[in-house]
Amino acid sequence: MLWASGLGPARGLRGALGQTLDAVVLDAHAGLSPERLAIAEGLVRGGGALVLRLPPECAAPDPLGQAALCVEPFTAQDVGTRWWRRLERACGAAWIERAHAETLPLIPPAFAPTGTPEQAQVIEALIAHLSGEPGVRTVLIAERGRGKSSALGAALAQLHARAPAPLCCVVTAPTLEAAREVLRFAAPAPVEFVALDALDGLSTAPDILVVDEAAQLPVPALTALCARWPEARLAFATTTRGYEGTGRGFVLRFLADLRQAEPPPRELSLTAPIRWAVDDPLEAWTRALLLFEAEPAQLEAAGERPERARAHVLDRDALVASPQTLSALFGLLVHAHYRTTPDDLVRVLDAPNLTIHALSLGDALVGACVIAVEGGLTAERCAALARGEGRLRGHALADTLMTQAGCVEAGTLRLARSVRIAVHPAVRRAGLASRLVEHVHAHHADVDAFGTVFGATAEVVRFRQRCGYHAVRVGVSAGARSGEPSVVMVRCNTPRAAQVLAPLRPRLARALPLQRALMQAEGHWHADDALSAVLSDALAAPAPLTQDTVAEAVAFYAGGAAPYEGWAAWVRPWVEAHARLLDALDPRAAAVIRARVLAALPWRQVAHLAGLPGVPAAQRALRPAVRALLARADLTPSSRSRTPS
């Protein structure tokens, strides 16, 4: 049995993955994370029990639990209770159904080496594909608890046993923990786990490469694997629903591209559960509560024309009272965004800074845009945040502009950030996304600026440009799942915003060429030529490099928390001008500066040359090293807090 809190990061429960338990108890007195609930449900064997310890019915949620959704200037009292009431109603329905049930849930038979007959067929199909013609790509998609990973491992074990000569088989996954089930069932075959970022170090191509939980990996990285080893037999497996992620990015982007290739991929699926019975009541209850089956609304074939769609703001009390509308909303979000998670359900229902804008054709929801209101902070609070003092939850746009882009005053502006935007697949390319954005602009006419932060693609950047937005910052690393750098785009709505944000476009024009080169050296720039072109073409003239602007930028980097790559265009010339002072620094600090700033070496080499244990240590060492060089250059303390021009 496992006893755990209902709140906290989902990763806190992931250590139990792979276990099959008689019972899991979630103490939900302080609150209940949908992601933790989803994980817990998947741990319980057929015939077992998931126990939720809830406070008395209709009791107010614990303020400590509500605080997780608080964003300045809101308090716990401003957080909604819609998710909590939905949970109470769902628990009541489950208890009533159980009280009137005539039979207990079926207990599946004991697990056999081949699992279900369906799994045995999939194992044989995997063996056939992975021992067949070179260059074959195989895709295995399954829901949780279907034996996907064990099927992969069993297939690898049998491939080794049947092979006339030794095979080089490699497994990769988001983490070693995520691959343990494959490796366990592959034993005793000599299958090696290699992290995704270490695959480049392989001296020879593997005969077979298995990618488990592929939806958790960047799509460009998956595409690159196919291009790098065209003759290897590759198998991509992923979970399509649940806490592992919806898998929509994998299906909508990677698999769609793979289907256009020659030869097309061999597609397999697993539907029958192994650890519990078909139509298991606990799985059905969790699916319904967490909207795992959510799909966009059904549209009539000869329905109304898209241009007649009605724009409006969704009332969240009415939304939670209408299961059909709530499911349609999440169906839109899940189908359009690979990052949608079960915890987004709580945020959409209860976060006090969110507004949901919608487009409807008749009764059908055909578009949605989630907006977060941010900023409006005091100048003192902004200055402290820019110095790295404290954290700002829920203000992603304001925080990025202040602490990363160097526009400290941006936090004082009232901002409206587009968190998600989605349009029904059946009516895309009909101007509805632009209609949504126009509606947002009209509804939030009192804000200083509109903005959005997203994994950059040429198509979305162009769309935002048509809506009047401009890129003002590009992230310095690839997104964990998109594989693309993030981009910040803003549209000014008041003269004050235009004045405050004016330096950002020329600053990005100055920063981006060197930033991109440094990211490419690290393997973090997966942007295609189209994205690179659309970003570069829209930039303003680069900000001039004067003695004052360089000194201000270096002081901002040294005194804050912004990553080096975004400020390298200023730090490098300043260090070059003061290189004579490096010998006076601590040898390790001087080595880090010489390797990263002057030689532009990748972080891994910087760590090696400076005698540091790894990349994170090298990255942490650079800022204090530059700060020490600033002190040697005898810059005044006041200059370190100035905002760069």
Give a label for each model feature.
Residues 1-4, 138-141, 166-179:
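Conserved RecA-like ASCE P-loop NTPase motor core of nucleic-acid helicases/translocases
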Residues 7-39, 189-228:
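Conserved RecA-like ASCE ATPase "motif II neighborhood" in helicase/translocase motors
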Residues 14-105:
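N-terminal accessory nucleic-acid engagement/regulatory domains that precede
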Residues 70-121, 245, 255-298:
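Conserved coupling/interface region of RecA-like P-loop/ASCE motor cores
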Residues 151, 155, 436:
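Hydrophobic positions on the alpha1 helix immediately C-terminal to the Walker A/P-loop
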Residues 196-200, 208, 220-224, 232-338, ...:
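Terminal substrate-recognition subdomain of acyl/acetyltransferases
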Residues 353-372, 379:
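Conserved beta-hairpin
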